[in-house]
Swiss-Prot record:
Gene name, Swiss-Prot/TrEMBL: hemL
Involved pathway(s): Porphyrin-containing compound metabolism; protoporphyrin-IX biosynthesis; 5-aminolevulinate from L-glutamyl-tRNA(Glu): step 2/2; Porphyrin-containing compound metabolism; chlorophyll biosynthesis
Subcellular location: Cytoplasm
GO-annotated biological processes: chlorophyll biosynthetic process; protoporphyrinogen IX biosynthetic process
GO molecular function: glutamate-1-semialdehyde 2,1-aminomutase activity; pyridoxal phosphate binding; transaminase activity
Protein's name in the database: Glutamate-1-semialdehyde 2,1-aminomutase
InterPro entries: 4pyrrol_synth_GluAld_NH2Trfase, Aminotrans_3, Aminotrans_3_PPA_site, PyrdxlP-dep_Trfase, PyrdxlP-dep_Trfase_major, PyrdxlP-dep_Trfase_small
Gene Ontology CC terms, in alphabetical order: cytoplasm
EC nos: 5.4.3.8
HAMAP family associated with the record: HemL_aminotrans_3
Catalytic activity: (S)-4-amino-5-oxopentanoate = 5-aminolevulinate
Binding partners and assembly: Homodimer.
Keywords from the named record: Chlorophyll biosynthesis, Cytoplasm, Isomerase, Porphyrin biosynthesis, Pyridoxal phosphate
Length: 431
């Protein structure tokens, strides 16, 4: 068991000045219990905490580090920009055009794109754009999907909202809640019912094509195809939230993987290379409604800043040059097979969901295809499992309802260590 003396001291101090002692709720370890761990350094596939303990990292800053932490080329590019260009100007820069052109080549749906500073900004802006474009007010989202902390999305949400056991948030007005309709993930009839009941009022349907904030739940291809057809029939804007799965499950994201093209796409995480960034883009006829070309307002002081764009550009260039996706698939499949073999040895039959290098081990035997099946997972057992893995030097998400990310820099030795630790942790979860 790692000694966490300094982490405990820092957490007590933090609680005096920061709500709950953290700047994002899931970091507080409320779901799994214990002391939140304060990290001091990350490099490659490893992190070291303030007490000197080292961990094999499967959180990857919640998704951005597909190439590992402190990737040498990305780090060098950031340093060059900081020393020779600057951190921000509040003016247009050439780099904005470079990344916009690159994204339009990589992501099937993107003809025009606007850079922002976070995934939340991207999804909020995309929904506002859809409303402005259609002249309609209501949106459909899916139970358990998380699209950031915008008011419209905190109705039956996933991620930290679900982790804390309350899928709704106080502070969301009744009017906002009334304009947010929730359907069942992977259930097209639930969507059709809402559309029929609100015909002519639905501006957008927003979905994570690989839901990564209720554990990991892949959409069925036929479900996405049906959504596309329904949106075309009803004049509804289809938004894919690819903040997490974009550039992760395939270079062109889930829309490339599934062969289904949305009207708008939101992005983040990997396109910032570990720095704060987001983007939304899509069909030209819709994006031309964004100010200053159109009347749908969106702005940001640090949007398109050189540091974030540098990190994102270098990350995308590496992904294009090295094509890590077959290797990521091999590594993640090795873990999945190893975990399955361990469960067979122990007479367990828990569910594993995986799409590429995004995965989740659910402590339930119920197939997980939506929010209701996800919450059948035994959170207490996951907490024991988490702490056993932590004791063995493996850092997982401190929540049953988050993804496990395999990175390009996880070595075969790292993977073997993880499979061995998984066996011990499964035993510990049942003691």
């Amino acid at each position: 068991m790692p000694q966490l003396t300094k982490s405990a001291e820092l957490f007590e101090l933090a609680k005096k000045f920061i709500p709950g002692g953290v700047n994002s709720p899931v970091r507080a370890f409320k779901s799994v219990g214990g002391t939140p761990i304060y990290m001091a350094k990350g490099e490659g596939a490893y992190m070291t905490d303030v007490d000197g303990n080292t961990y094999l990292d499967y959180v990857g800053s919640w998704g951005p580090f597909i190439l590992g932490s402190m990737q040498p080329r990305v780090t060098a590019a950031i340093e060059y920009t900081l020393r020779n260009i600057g951190s921000s100007f509040g003016t247009p820069i050439e780099m904005e055009i470079e990344i916009a052109e690159l994204l339009s080549r990589i992501v099937p749906s993107i003809e025009m794109v606007r850079m922002v500073n976070s995934g939340t900004e991207a999804t909020m802006s995309a929904v506002r754009l859809a409303r402005g474009y259609t002249g309609r007010d209501k949106i459909i989202k899916f139970e358990g999907c998380y699209h950031g902390h915008g008011d419209s999305f905190l109705i039956k949400a996933g991620s930290g909202v679900l982790t804390l056991g309350s899928p709704d948030s106080p502070g969301v007005t009744k009017g906002t809640a009334a304009d947010t309709l929730n359907a069942t993930y992977n259930d097209i009839e639930s969507v059709r019912l809402l559309v029929n009941e609100n015909r002519g009022d639905i501006a957008a349907i927003i979905i994570e094509p690989v839901a990564g904030n209720t554990g990991v739940i892949p959409a069925k291809k036929e479900f996405l195809v049906a959504l596309r057809e329904l949106c075309d029939q009803e004049g509804i804007v289809l938004i894919f939230d690819e903040v997490m799965c974009g550039f992760r499950v395939a270079l062109g994201g889930a829309q490339e993987l599934y062969g289904v093209t949305p009207d708008l796409t939101t992005m983040g995480k990997i396109i910032g290379g570990g720095l704060p960034v987001g983007a939304f883009g899509g069909k030209r006829k819709i994006m031309e409604n964004v100010a200053p070309l159109g009347s749908v307002y969106q702005a940001g002081t640090l949007s398109g800043n050189p540091l974030a764009l540098t990190a994102g550009l270098e990350t995308l260039k590496i992904l294009m040059e090295e094509d890590p996706y077959p290797e990521l698939e091999r590594k993640a499949a090795f873990l999945e097979a190893g975990f399955r073999e361990n469960m067979q040895k122990l007479g367990l039959n828990y569910v594993q969901n995986r799409v590429g290098s995004m995965a989740c081990l659910f402590f339930t035997e119920t197939p997980v295809v939506d929010y209701k099946s996800a919450i059948t997972a035994d959170v207490a057992k996951y907490g024991k499992y988490f702490h056993s893995m932590l004791d063995q030097g493996i850092y997982l998400a401190p929540s049953q309802f988050e993804a496990m990310f395999t990175s390009y820099v996880h070595s075969d030795e790292d993977l073997e260590k993880t499979v061995k630790a998984n066996y011990n942790a499964l035993v510990a979860a049942h003691q």
